[in-house]
Amino acid sequence: MRIDTDVKLDYSDVLLRPKRSTMGSRKDVDLVREYTFRNSQKTYRGIPIMAANMGGVGTFNMAEELIKVPMFTCLDKNYQPADIWDWFGNHVHKPDLQSHIAISTGITEVDQERIDTTLKLCRSIEYVCIDVANGYSERFLDYVARFREKYPHITIIAGNVVTAELTEELILRGADIG
């Protein structure tokens, strides 16, 4: 462990200062952005805000609502492959929905079996969120690298980390979003 003694800022230290604008109304502001990811080479177009993959947040209902904006949803990792397959099957007529959803997984063998099954059933899945409580473990970094090797076409969201150094390491190991 290393102790940093330099000053750190928190949200309470940040002031968003407005500046002059040519916009006639705040309704004219366009938050939609387009990103091409480094490793998967896929392009995302939407508002870059994600609903977390928590049980009460990363739900099918949340995904259906956020796509209207368009925002992104990381589904709760406890959804079973059959549930995801059924849900995707019922929404096949909404191709934009699939480009705004990530299927979530952990890094255990059981998690790997579940995500493998899900990706076999739902071949149109574009995003996977690899989520652990401590993104600073070598085991997590190694898992991201193995997942990238196995699924080069998937856009990988990986975390949780808070430092630029580990975000960079995740991207070098194969993640697209860290």
Task: Enumerate the predicted regions with their spans.
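Active-site entrance/lid segments in N-terminal catalytic domains of soluble metabolic enzymes
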Residues: 1-177
